[in-house]
């Protein structure tokens, strides 16, 4: 199998740089298209950053491959759940509790705090049910579901592959 000849460090570097690249693309779209991210969007952004750093840690410390791939998979599963919930909110906006109009949950409190500390990166000003941007008929939340599923599959492959630093 040709993939097994690629060093594990390269796989982790791809994961890390890919996730950080997704954050950069999201920031560019937000700025250029004047999009207003919601608390769930910002939390997904935070998860992409965390997975990116886990990938870079795997690049620097490839001996911890099992730990790094498990962390990436766990964060990916969490991201998948958040993105799927936002996708549901966008599909059924009449049934969805809108972010910001109820008592804040742990995610909203974290996002609010991050937004005060680094507003250009983490300030949530949008609504979770809005579909302001679409590509090929899929909203950004829909794309995040697919991307997080891919990250989980990628992390599982990193976990089960033969060790080759």
Curated annotation (Swiss-Prot):
Cysteines engaged in disulfide bonds, as pairs: 38-41, 99-128
GO biological process: protein folding
Top-level lineage group: Bacteria
Topological domains, Cytoplasmic: 1-11, 62-66, 162-165
Residues that span the membrane, as ranges: 12-28, 47-61, 67-84, 143-161
GO molecular function terms attached to this record: electron transfer activity; protein-disulfide reductase activity
Principal location class: membrane
Compartments reported by the entry: Cell inner membrane
Pfam families: DsbB
GO cellular component, one term: plasma membrane
Keywords: Cell inner membrane, Cell membrane, Chaperone, Disulfide bond, Electron transport, Membrane, Oxidoreductase, Redox-active center, Transmembrane, Transmembrane helix, Transport
Family: Belongs to the DsbB family.
UniProt name for this protein: Disulfide bond formation protein B
Gene field: dsbB
């Amino acid at each position: 199998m040709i993939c097994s000849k690629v060093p594990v460090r390269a796989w982790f570097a791809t994961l890390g740089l890919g996730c950080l690249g997704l954050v950069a693309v999201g920031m560019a779209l937000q700025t250029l298209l004047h999009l207003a991210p919601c608390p769930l969007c910002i939390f997904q952004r935070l998860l992409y950053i965390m997975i990116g750093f886990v990938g870079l840690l795997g690049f620097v410390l490839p001996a911890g491959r099992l730990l790094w791939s498990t962390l990436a998979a766990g964060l990916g599963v969490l991201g998948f759940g958040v993105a799927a919930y936002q996708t549901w909110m966008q599909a059924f906006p009449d049934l969805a509790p809108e972010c910001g109009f109820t008592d804040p949950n742990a995610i909203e409190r974290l996002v609010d705090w991050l937004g005060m500390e680094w507003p250009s990166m983490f300030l949530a000003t949008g609504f979770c049910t809005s579909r302001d941007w679409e590509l090929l008929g899929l909203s950004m939340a829909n794309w995040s579901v697919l991307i997080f599923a891919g990250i989980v599959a990628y992390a599982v492959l990193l976990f089960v592959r033969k060790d080759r630093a």
